[in-house]
C-alpha cells in the first residue's frame, strides 16, 4: 500500500466503463494516482487513474450531468461529477496541479514570463509558406532550441484568415499530448504574429515515405497507433483536424509521430452530432461528405486516417489521380481495391475506415484500438513512449537540420517578409489576447 500522503479525497459520482451507469464512489488522490473505492474506508480500490499518463482534465457537459468534469487517459475518458460547482473547481485544480508536478519531475511549474523576439537567436530557415516562415531559433537564456513560426498580419487580414489563425493559437494553447506539437509561447509585434513551437527535426513523414516508397505493415501499425491517440485527443477536445496528410506529420529525433499545422482545424464540436460545412483540406484525403457539401463531423478525420494508412502501406492514397476532378469522382464512386500484399487485418480496417457513409464508418477510437490490426499494441505503453519506434531518423541531437530541405536551410534566416506593413488600430484589435506562455517547463 502506498505511503504517499493523501492530497485530496471525497465522494464523486462516476460513469461506469462498461454499462455506463453512474455510481457514487470515494476518491483518493495520492502518489500521482487517483484511486476510487466502493465506499469510504475500503482498502482495495475498484480502479486507479494514473495522472502521469492523463490528457486533458476539464469541465464537461457532454454527459448532461450537473457539475461534470472529465479526465482523459490513453485507455478511456473518465466522466465524473461533484456535488457542487466549488467542489468541481477544486478537484480540477488539484488534479491538474498534481499532473503538472508529475510531468515536471517533481518541481513546481515556472511562473509565466514575458517573452519577445529579442529573447531568441535566429539559427536556420526550416520552412516557408504563403503567410510566413518557420525559423529554427535558440532561446538565449536557456539554450533551448525551438521552431519559431512567423506570420504576416497583413497577409492574414487580406486573405480573411484571422479566425483560422486565432483558432490555431487557441487549439495549440489547450492541447498537451505526446504526439501533437506543443506551443511554448506566442506573442506579436505591430506587423507579425509569432508561435514558438517544439522543434521537431526527424523529417516529414512525406519525405520518408517518398524515400522508402512504402512502409512495412509493422511500421504503419506503429505510426497509425500514435496518430489514433493524437486524433482521439483532438476530438475529445472538440477539435476536427481536417488536414491529415504525410506533410503534416513529422518524426521526432527519437522516431515518434508529431502532428503539426492546426491552421485548418475547427474547434467547438463537442458532441457526436456537431457538424461544420467549410470545404477545406487536401484533395487526396477528403472524405465523400466534404465533397457533397452537406456538412460533416469528426468522421472526416477517420476517412483521412484510412487514406493515410493505405498510402503508407502501398505508396499512394487509395483513389489517387493526377486529375483532381477525376480523383473526386473516384472518392465518391469507385470501389476500393487492394494490392495482393495487404494483410486481411489491414484490409478489414481500411474497408471500415474508408466507408463512404459517415454513419457506418469506423470512427470510434475505442473500437479502432480494439481492431485486430492493432492487437499487438499496448496503448498505455505507447502513450508513455515506452515502445521503441521502428525507425530512428539519422539526426545528431535535437538541433540537427540534416532532414530539412536545403532549399530552406541554404537561405539566411530573417524575420522580414515581402510587402509587410503595420495594421491600423482597428485591425490590430483582431489580434488582442494572442500572447501566451506555457504554464510549465515540461512543455519546453
Curated annotation (Swiss-Prot):
Keyword entries, A-Z: ATP-binding, Chemotaxis, Kinase, Nucleotide-binding, Phosphoprotein, Serine/threonine-protein kinase, Transferase
Protein name: RAC family serine/threonine-protein kinase homolog
Residue numbers of Phosphothreonine PTMs: 278
Transmembrane residue ranges: none
Stated role: Predominantly involved during the aggregation to control cell polarity and chemotaxis. Phosphorylates talB, gefN, gefS, PI4P 5-kinase and gacQ.
Catalytic activity field: L-seryl-[protein] + ATP = O-phospho-L-seryl-[protein] + ADP + H(+); L-threonyl-[protein] + ATP = O-phospho-L-threonyl-[protein] + ADP + H(+)
Active-site feature positions: 243
Positions annotated to bind ATP: 126-134, 149
One example GO MF annotation: cAMP-dependent protein kinase activity
Null mutant phenotype: Cells exhibit aggregation-stage defects, with the aggregates that form producing normal fruiting bodies.
